[in-house]
């Protein structure tokens, strides 16, 4: 079972990591007041980066609450997001959304991200089976 922690190796830490996701995202999921960008990372676990600027969410209390909620939602859903580098970009108005609504919204966004993700492993394994037959 995958651990549900949010340790250092599950975070995007350097500007280079963020730039890689911004420059060539393989998945893009727009949501209400936010945008999720994702890119394959070649690892067995996902990594998360958050971009919540003062322009989009004025109060530090709200920015911290949003970061806490985003990290928690990511932590609880990380087993279905394995192998992705994910950046969440907050937009204006996100700070006014209530916690239960945000949790529900993120649940839907993670599922949309997984559905939009290409699955080459399934196609490759099907090709291998057909050659052996």
Curated annotation (Swiss-Prot):
Its EC number is 3.1.26.5. Keywords: Endonuclease, Hydrolase, Nuclease, RNA-binding, tRNA processing. InterPro entries: Ribosomal_Su5_D2-typ_SF (IPR020568), Ribsml_uS5_D2-typ_fold_subgr (IPR014721), RNase_P (IPR000100), RNase_P_CS (IPR020539). PROSITE patterns: RIBONUCLEASE_P. One of its GO terms (cellular component) is ribonuclease P complex. The keyword Ligase does not apply. GO terms for molecular function: 3'-tRNA processing endoribonuclease activity; ribonuclease P activity; tRNA binding. It is an enzyme of class 3 (hydrolase). GO terms for biological process: tRNA 5'-leader removal. It catalyses: Endonucleolytic cleavage of RNA, removing 5'-extranucleotides from tRNA precursor. Consists of a catalytic RNA component (M1 or rnpB) and a protein subunit. RNaseP catalyzes the removal of the 5'-leader sequence from pre-tRNA to produce the mature 5'-terminus. It can also cleave other RNA substrates such as 4.5S RNA. The protein component plays an auxiliary but essential role in vivo by binding to the 5'-leader sequence and broadening the substrate specificity of the ribozyme. Belongs to the RnpA family. This is Ribonuclease P protein component. It comes from Pseudomonas entomophila (strain L48). The lineage of its organism: Bacteria, Pseudomonadati, Pseudomonadota, Gammaproteobacteria, Pseudomonadales. The gene is rnpA.
